[in-house]
Curated annotation (Swiss-Prot):
It comes from Homo sapiens (Human). Pfam families: 7tm_4. The keyword Repeat does not apply. This is Olfactory receptor 6B3. Glycans are attached at residue 5. Disulfide bonds join 97-189. Signal peptide: none annotated. The gene is OR6B3. Keywords: Cell membrane, Disulfide bond, G-protein coupled receptor, Glycoprotein, Membrane, Olfaction, Receptor, Sensory transduction, Transducer, Transmembrane, Transmembrane helix. Residues 47-54, 121-139, 218-237, 293-331 are cytoplasmic. It is found in: Cell membrane. It is a multi-pass membrane protein. The chain crosses the membrane at residues 26-46, 55-75, 100-120, 140-160, 197-217, 238-258, 272-292.
Amino acid sequence: MSGENVTRVGTFILVGFPTAPGLQYLLFLLFLLTYLFVLVENLAIILTVWSSTSLHRPMYYFLSSMSFLEIWYVSDITPKMLEGFLLQQKRISFVGCMTQLYFFSSLVCTECVLLASMAYDRYVAICHPLRYHVLVTPGLCLQLVGFSFVSGFTISMIKVCFISSVTFCGSNVLNHFFCDISPILKLACTDFSTAELVDFILAFIILVFPLLATMLSYAHITLAVLRIPSATGCWRAFFTCASHLTVVTVFYTALLFMYVRPQAIDSRSSNKLISVLYTVITPILNPLIYCLRNKEFKNALKKAFGLTSCAVEGRLSSLLELHLQIHSQPL
């Protein structure tokens, strides 16, 4: 476009979920309830872990760090989406869009590394139980969590710097409900091959290497479990890892479907539904997956909030049932 007057885009318009006006208020209510559920669940986990000395162990330290991440994660996306549903205010400034993209990308990258750290914790617990407290110390846990956040936010800063240097002109309509990389680059009117290459390389590093580390940990865990002679021992070992493995499977399945496929840059409506899975639904399901069948945590929650054991299980089960009913409705 050299030699031509180029009007740079100063604001973007988020298409969101085009529906009838009446349905916008219903979607606002559904996502508001989901957002509140995420806040309540994850805050309850953080408060329970930090107030119960019986939970001052590496597994629960990682869990509380994950809960902190989930609160930040959903708070980056949902408030702007709720504003669009309620006030029909779908504009977002260029700086606001880049900021939202930066935090979203940072939190996704951080979660990848944090899940790999949690897989290592499970590996040591299953394969080296007698040396667990020697190998997985509080200092190591702090270093792993710190490395997860530092690496995630540093890599994302590089990615967003390259993306923000691209010129955007002409159409400013983002066919999405938040600022994601693919729909943003679709609006570029200058060559963005460098930004795309940098994004691909960094995404490969931060997604694939933690995934390989997680898979390697579970390969060793599987071999160790198969060597356990008793069925009861096998079941206990599997139960120790089942929650984390479920979360890893859901998280990476959604990410790989969204970004590791041909023509991912074509922003289609189906992408929005997958994005809802890992930006809104996953943060509310993760605490339930980790804690619903964890008797130790439910007992600590009972002591922390003065609830009976049956009440804790009943409220968690009711919350999961209500959430599934809400999101079984078509958007």
